[in-house]
Amino acid sequence: MNRLPTCLLAATLFLGSASLYAEEPACARVRLADPGWSDIAVTNATAAFLLESLGYQVKIDTLSVPIIYGGLRDGQVDAFLGGWMPAHQDYHDKFVASGQVERLGRNLDGTRFTLAVPRYVWDAGVHRFEDLAAQGQRFNRKLYGIGSGAPANQSIQKMIDANQFGLGDWKLVESSEQAMLAELGRAEKRQRWLVFLGWTPHPMNIRHDLRYLEGGEQYFGDRGQVYTLARKGYAAQCPNPARLLANLRFDLDMENRLMSDALEGTATPASATRAWLKANPRVLEAWLQGVTSRDGGDALAAVRGQP
């Protein structure tokens, strides 16, 4: 009797209709990770709403980026929707390229993550990384980053350690995303000079008049992508939720809008997501392609039936 090769069988389990296979009890709960970033809050909220509509339980743990990658490797985290590239290149090389963590798919294109300054600093002539050192006193020789352990912070520290762009005597200030943006707000009120980590998608691009510095591609890369990652073997063990997570595709406008609604208005990431999906129902057909409810039912009907 002919036997399917192991790799073909694994692909069939993932790509075929998940309802044809008995799902392991461990798949009933999907464990996601959140590094405390606004973009991942809204993409996690989207994934959680869809998964819960299909009959799954969702647990979201707030963890630092190094702990998230370690959790994926050790099987303590099922999936992470925040694999920013090239910002996470070192983590990719250590965990993904080595086969300890798997990629389910790319969920966003066109991202940017690099140092930025307020518009009034740009107008004064600071356009490139090379322009910073000459104005060190005005910047108080500080580069404002985000949470400790973030890959972007590591890139800044490498730049300082190498005295790149003459920044060897500068200091990295690590804080949460929210604290960094609060510092930006205070600086803007006083027209104080500040250089900080900026990125898109994020409502900071709407709320603040900022400009991205040029010339830092060696450390921050150019336009990037965000990938959905999973623990090794997750797609084979839990093909239905893995298929949904692999199907998720976002765009910059959607994420900026959802984050703005959640951060500036009265909406939470979850309520902002539901409102967006009700206004944009056609996206569900692509996201739910090849997916069923946990009991094998119609996924589209299950999601559309939610209040």
Where do the protein language model's features map onto the residues?
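Immediate post-signal peptide segment of exported/extracytoplasmic ligand-binding proteins
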Residues: 21-31, 134-140, 287, 302-306
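Short, well-ordered beta-strand elements
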Residues: 25-39, 56-61, 140-144, 245
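Pocket-flanking alpha-helical
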Residues: 44, 61-99, 183, 203-209
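Ligand-binding cleft/hinge of the Venus flytrap
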Residues: 47-54, 136-170, 278
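Ligand-binding pocket segment of bilobal, Venus flytrap-like solute-binding proteins
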Residues: 77-81, 151-218
